[in-house]
């Protein structure tokens, strides 16, 4: 039995992530936690998030989680979801400029096309532009559920493994070493989302 730590810092519906993981990994221990020690001792980490990036960074600081998130992202399988993807980057345009965790070089940019509905909300295709174990048994251009007003712009585009079209193409999934992070919500994306979580649980 392995332990999967779901980082709970008060931002977003982490219980839905926990329930989805418990469904695909019934023999594993899926813990909601804000305790850096539990995260450190876990086998895998899931880093979800919703809301404003500035508020999330303050919550991470208050819970003394920043150093452990940085360590875990380099030492064990690590899945970022939605704002959990954006927080990995160095800088966001949100809140008149917000610094992130600077784990992944690049920026977080607001959709600025006046013809688009913001936030980008609903189902959209993800083009698997690079192979990765977390795409196993998921058809290319499968649809996933998203809710976001900002998108990530990595400095090194070789880390991009998924692209989505909304006004223009943007990175909706990245992978660097032990990190896999997505803009969409696998826990809300029915069978393909559950398959991605299953792949994460089995990824070595």
Label every PLM stretch briefly.
Residues 1-5:
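Extreme N-terminal starter segment of soluble prokaryotic enzymes
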Residues 29-41:
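Short acidic low-complexity segments
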Residues 39-49:
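Short acidic/histidine-rich motifs immediately flanking catalytic phosphotransfer sites
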Residues 51-123:
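Cysteine-nucleophile active-site neighborhood
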Residues 90-166:
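Pocket-forming structural segment of enzyme catalytic cores
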Residues 168-175:
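Short, surface-exposed beta-strand/loop micro-motifs that present aromatic residues
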Residues 182-204:
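Acyltransferase
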């Amino acid at each position: 039995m392995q332990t999967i730590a779901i980082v709970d810092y008060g931002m977003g519906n982490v219980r839905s992530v926990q329930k989805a993981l418990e469904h695909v990994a019934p023999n594993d221990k899926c813990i909601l936690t804000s305790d850096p020690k539990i995260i450190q001792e876990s086998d895998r980490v899931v880093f979800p998030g919703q809301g404003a990036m500035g508020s999330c960074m303050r919550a991470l600081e208050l819970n003394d989680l920043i150093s452990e998130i940085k360590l875990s992202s380099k030492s064990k399988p690590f899945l970022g979801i939605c704002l959990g993807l954006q927080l990995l980057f160095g800088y966001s345009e949100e809140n008149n400029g917000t610094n992130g965790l600077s784990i992944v070089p690049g920026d977080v940019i607001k959709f600025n096309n006046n013809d688009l509905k913001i936030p980008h909300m609903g189902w959209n295709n993800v083009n698997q532009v690079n192979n990765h174990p977390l795409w196993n048994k998921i058809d290319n251009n499968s649809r996933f559920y998203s809710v976001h007003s900002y998108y990530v712009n990595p400095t090194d585009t070789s880390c991009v493994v998924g692209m989505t079209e909304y006004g223009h193409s943007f990175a909706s999934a990245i992978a660097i070493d032990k990190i896999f992070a997505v803009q969409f919500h696998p826990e809300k994306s029915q069978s393909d989302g559950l398959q991605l979580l299953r792949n994460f649980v089995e990824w070595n």
